[in-house]
Structure formats: C-alpha cells, structure tokens
C-alpha cells in the first residue's frame, strides 16, 4: 500500500466523502484538479478507492492507514499554515472556522489581522460533545488545542488550535472551507469594530446584497 500512498494520495483518501467528485475533493484540499485526478487514478488502480457515481474509499482500514501516514508525516515535518487549514477536514466530526478565521474565509483570504507566521492560532467552532475527540485528533498531529489563544512563549511551535465548543453548529461553505454563517461573522466584527472596520468595508464591497454602511480609508503614511 505504501508504494501508492504519498502525502497527496493519503490526503485525498481522508478528504473523500462517499459520492464526491474529483473536483470537489480538489476544492476541499485546495490542490490542482489534475494533481488530484492523477492520484485518484493510482488509488483506483491499486483498489483503494472506487469511482461509481462518485468516489468511495473501499475499506475503512485504508482511511485509518492514510490518517496514520499523514499524522506521522506531520510529526516529522510540522504542518505549514496552509496545511493546517486542511487538516481539520480529515477529522470525523463537523466543524466551522470561527472568529478571525471566519473573517479570513468570508473575505476569501483578503483580510488577515492579529496573527504572524511565527504565532498563528486557528479558530474552530466544534460541537461540545466532540471536544475530546478533536483534542485527541489534533494531538496526533502535534498541534496543541485550548479554548483561548495561548501565549507564544508557552508553545513549542507557531501553530495552535483554539476550539470554541457549541451545543450545535450552523455551517456554510466558502471556497471549500466550512465556516460559521456570514451574519454571525458580521456580528463578531461589529463587536470588535476597531479591529475589523476595514474588513466590514471589504464585506460591503464583496457582497452586493449587503449594505453595512461602513467606509474605511487607510491614512497615508509619511514617506521616510
């Protein structure tokens, strides 16, 4: 099996939901369609996935082996920020990007604030009953979890996962990312207006059905 199972193939196995198209898997993984198509062909030839009115992983043991492979790879080479956004999709429980990440997703990566590459929390809304399972899942990738952002000096690596437990989840999707609803994201930005004024103005420009009444203009900096 491991002759076929490289990082891309393992991630594809983990990303597949029965009935998915190759294009949908590529969107979930944010990987070029042709790369995914070629890997799917190899996996199908090896008998690990089938394609009949959509993709299916033929045996749950294949998925378990893929998860073990990806987690082992992460323990050797820590995930990048881009990879960290994909990893939660390999879990067996629903989630939605929240807080700063909801703003990031709804602006399609156009607004980023309060994070640096060497200090980068990801914010995930999860169901209360799944908190322990998510903690164990991220631990297998050497990604620490907490309910509030932890100081950088207390962490060994720049990435951390901040879990926001909820009784239930309302999930929407933007470019393959599960995210809390747009209205809730706007409410979060209004509650933190000073930090997100420019993001609210960006929402107004991006979504024609919105009229948030927010204008923002960056002051010009004096040239040295």
Region locations from a protein language model:
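Phosphate-handling catalytic interfaces
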Residues: 111-224
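Active-site nucleotide-donor binding segment shared across nucleotidyl transfer reactions
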Residues: 73-138
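Short acidic, hydrophobic short linear motifs in intrinsically disordered regions
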Residues: 16-29
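Short, cationic-aromatic polyanion-contact patches
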Residues: 2-8, 54-75
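Short amphipathic alpha-helical interaction segments
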Residues: 30-44
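Hydrophobic residues on short alpha-helical segments
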Residues: 10-14
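Alpha-helix N-cap/N′ positions at the starts of helices
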Residues: 4-8, 20, 181
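A short, conserved structural fragment
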Residues: 44-54
